[in-house]
Amino acid sequence: MSLITAGRLCARILGAKNSPCALIAARQASSSANLKDVLSDLIPKEQTRIKNFRQQYGKNVIGQITVDMMYGGMRGMKGLVYETSVLDPDEGIRFRGYSIPECQKLLPKAPGGEEPLPEGLFWLLVTGEAPSQEQVNWISKEWAKRAALPSHVVTMLDNFPTNLHPMSQLSAAITALNSESNFARGYAEGVNKTKYWELIYEDSMDLIAKLPCVAAKIYRNLYREGSSIGAIDSNLDWSHNFTNMLGYTDPQFTELMRLYLTIHSDHEGGNVSAHTSHLVGSALSDPYLSFSAAMNGLAGPLHGLANQEVLVWLTSLQKDLGGEVSDEKLRDYIWNTLNSGRVVPGYGHAVLRKTDPRYTCQREFALKHLPNDPMFKLVAQLYKIVPNVLLEQGKAKNPWPNVDAHSGVLLQYYGMKEMNYYTVLFGVSRALGVLAQLIWSRALGFPLERPKSMSTDGLMQLVGSKSG
């Protein structure tokens, strides 16, 4: 999206003709295929734009904080600046202003492919501009060139016990990659802070390039008897190399991986993994340490393990009710789940109030490629029934399915049945969004994050309540 388009969008949202966003100068898509060169041109302009904005509007109040917000996980509290994506309760995620369907149409595809290449989304997240095919090809080759793992990380991965969770292995390996950090080395040598973003960029590009190798190594060691991941092919895209290293050769699975890695990449800045990387990065920890911390957050059952919980529930449902199930029996099963104090996994979202567009695009993929798969048919049947049951129950603010209601079913269909591994794929994808933002956080000089905390007694005193 050009800056002038973004400005018009912002002005429309804010309802102000003279909104600072509306004053942005027009910017054409950059012709250079080198992402760092494009950033070098964009960053000074954005620094000036934000400086002027803060000078004029820095004291403006943008919201109120309630006691419930402080006890309720800061839900709805506006407290972060996060550039790469915005989550709208009704529309879902927008990557630099573009919806998922728009990205599917706009972003370059692999030869003969129909799904967007994650490389294109990364370019969009970093620059705000939809890339050309040449620019996406440059990213693919750049990541292939940077993909090799240092020997100590390979040795580390090969010596992990097989009962160590894949996410623990991923986090540990990413932390160990910090030995390669350009930023950590440059900071120790006293590099000028105006150069921070350049070193963060180099580390982020290196880390994204290496993640499929780390993830594939974990998969092969745990589930394929330690067989080799093979070599990176510089003529293939990032997702294609990843699926090859995992050991999957079905072109449809590669297309699914392109879609999966694109749609799981970013979801605004307040979720656990994005906020964690932002917080840790604000201490000037390098991208390896920041992203490793984010992965520890993603490993939590309330964040990245949800797709695994969906499959466990679906498998249990099939076991209890058998193959084809009538709508009436399915409805009774859902009510039994709710009445026992449990939730229906894959339904509801902290922000969204309509069907997650990430669910919708996966459903469209399934309708095209696996319409008769029994598990997909069950998911489609649930889509017709669960929202109505949840509305009848009256507790759910959002009765609609989220991304996790579908992704595991697709992976299972193509033979990836190792549910413990699914969050690793989520983590590889999430690197695109949080590292794109980390580059901008350092370019814009965001300070150490340090909100004020209060005790319950302090809150009671503030609002005039008696603590006794």
Curated annotation (Swiss-Prot):
UniProt xrefs under InterPro entries: Citrate_synth-like_lrg_a-sub (IPR016142), Citrate_synth-like_sm_a-sub (IPR016143), Citrate_synthase (IPR002020), Citrate_synthase_AS (IPR019810), Citrate_synthase_euk (IPR010109), Citrate_synthase_sf (IPR036969)
E.C. designation(s): 2.3.3.1
Reaction(s) this enzyme catalyzes, per UniProt: oxaloacetate + acetyl-CoA + H2O = citrate + CoA + H(+)
A GO molecular-function annotation: citrate (Si)-synthase activity
Compartments it resides in: Mitochondrion matrix
CDD domains assigned to the protein according to its UniProt record, in alphabetical order: ScCit1-2_like
Top-rank taxon: Eukaryota
Subunit structure: Homodimer.
Cellular component annotations (GO), alphabetically ordered: mitochondrial matrix
Disulfide bonds: none
Transmembrane segments: none
GO biological process, one term: carbohydrate metabolic process
Keywords of this entry: Mitochondrion, Transferase, Transit peptide, Tricarboxylic acid cycle
Catalytic residues in the record: 303, 349, 404
Protein name: Citrate synthase, mitochondrial
Pathway assigned to this chain's UniProt record: Carbohydrate metabolism; tricarboxylic acid cycle; isocitrate from oxaloacetate: step 1/2
Miscellaneous: Citrate synthase is found in nearly all cells capable of oxidative metabolism.
PANTHER family for the chain: CITRATE SYNTHASE (PTHR11739), CITRATE SYNTHASE, MITOCHONDRIAL (PTHR11739:SF8)
Matching NCBIfam families: cit_synth_euk, PRK09569.1
